[in-house]
Amino acid sequence: MVRFGMGSRSEADDVTLARSPRVASRRLAWARTAVALVAGIVVVTVVLHVVWLVRFRHGYVTEWDESGYLQFSLSNFDALHDGGPWGLAKIVGNRGTFGPLLPLLTALAYPFTGRGIFGSLLVLPLFFAGLVAASFALARQLVSDSWAVVAALAVAAIPAVTDYARLFHFALPATACMTAALWALLRSDGLRRVGWAVFSGLLVALTLLARTMTVAYIPGFALAAGVLLLVETSELRLRMRNLAIAAGLTGLVAGPWYLHNARSIYDSLVGSGYGEGAVVFGRHHPVASWGYWAKELRLDLLALWLPLAGCLLVSFSVAFVYLVARHKGLPRPSRPRSARSVGLLALVLVVLEGYLALTSSRNEGTGFALPWLPALVILGVAAIASIPARAPRVALASVLVALSVGAVTAKSGWVEPLAKVRRVSVPGLGLLPVTDGRGIIQVEVAGGGYDIGPVTHPLPALHRRWLPLARDVVAWSTHHAEQRGEQLHLTLGLNDLIFGNSRLILAAQLWFHQYLLVDYLRPYPDGDTVAAYRRELVSPRRVNALVIGDPSPVPNPNITRRKVEAAARSLGFTPVKSFVMPDGRTIWIWWREA
């Protein structure tokens, strides 16, 4: 049973522990119970994730971005198999833009999980378990063990955490590493303990290697470390030395890969975050507009769902009211004096810096905010624990636990009443979820224009046939190019959310152990015109194989088939091979005659 007492650790508690062996024994027993409860949370939720993966992912189509990341892992494993450790090091070191951590660890896990899509997906629940454990450990630096259990449960139940535990994506590994890095930083006792400081530096490096966009959170880490340095002046030289060692280790571990791939990383982060590449990933809002400052808030509410976000908001509000009442007005800013206050301030700065960093970019991304959402939830639990009145404290804690259990149940894939998609319109923010049991793959398939059936049922069987179709297209195209003595340059000339280039790239690596670059025609920036498509078919690569097909089920496709065909005919392409898609549509491979 979780006890909702006051949450902060105090010097008086330490004195009591020292003077009363009986109390110390009870505290130790409760600490062990708390660890057991968190272990139980991890076991139950990981089992739910694995069962969901078996029911909803095994043998089914992969998500768009996920397909590319899976190809990274498969090619890593193939390089290790063919070229040994040096072959693996070369392919990992030379593949820029995307963080290498997850594909590398997944490739190393294949001997245990099996080389393939499902074996890759089984790695993500391990990062989920690490995230829950790190959240518990981080919360223990700020609140009592009972409240840390509540925090671990709430983090485990974040809907976006559940979603990314079931998708081969970089968001969850980055979140687990960042949460663990914050824990090690606070555990360093104001950077006095060199071991913990060094460990935090290593975890920051792993965060950066997990996902390159976490570079945006380096200022947050710096602010948190600065708080630890500035709150007190004792042993300042020792603590600055330890911080320098930690920062040096971060650079030593993450630096070589970042330096080697600096150009591609810079182009990706700056181009897709602030340049022309960001145009397709989010709307432009003037800085002085509500849309500019609320864009990230809306995305965070999508990740948390309204009930959990509302509970956190009420918790912060009630805690603030009691704080004002206790000080008979707004408390004057002062230097934090306790380790708990320092830790809270550090997390607040990390969350605020993360929010502002994402606000500055129009790119809405996928799971960009996830790395600091656990810190936000832990701050919410700390706010509840700080409320001196027992009734609101217990009430808010009970609501948070109930909402967390409800969110886990809604995402379990079994309880349809809770899994039903419910959304409400919030002025200034649009439609926001109350409950939504769908996984990201179900959302993508539905977005492709297909009926996914009941939320608690696996996808229709036709969605098991998309990857085999991609395999057949790759096999025929490769064989035809070999017969003609040509190098295959394949491009998609249709706008289809399910039959995309990343699935063809994945199929080539999965079944044929080779990398095949597959491009696609873009109706931007030059528009849906014959002239634009002609240019794309000759530059930067001279395409010799073009896939054209019936329009996707999505209404108003932004690529017009007749314009693509006109561009292809003008360049000497003719249709040579047809395939029937799982939904009954037909695609043709057009080949350019020499």
Task: Kindly give the residue locations of the regions a language model identified.
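Start-transfer (signal-anchor) and selected internal transmembrane alpha helices
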Residues: M1-L53, R140, R241-L249, S341-L344, ...
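Membrane-interface transmembrane helices that cradle and orient dolichyl/undecaprenyl
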Residues: V15, R19, R140-S146, M178-F199, ...
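Membrane-proximal lumenal/periplasmic loop motifs of glycosylation machinery
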Residues: V54-S67, L80-P103, F112, F118, ...
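Transmembrane-helix motifs of polytopic, lipid-linked glycan transferases
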Residues: L122-V143, A180, F320, V324
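Hydrophobic, aromatic-rich transmembrane alpha-helices
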Residues: G226, G248-G251, L302-R340, V348, ...
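Membrane-lumen/periplasm interface segments of specific transmembrane helices
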Residues: M240-V279, W305-G310, Y355, T359-S360, ...
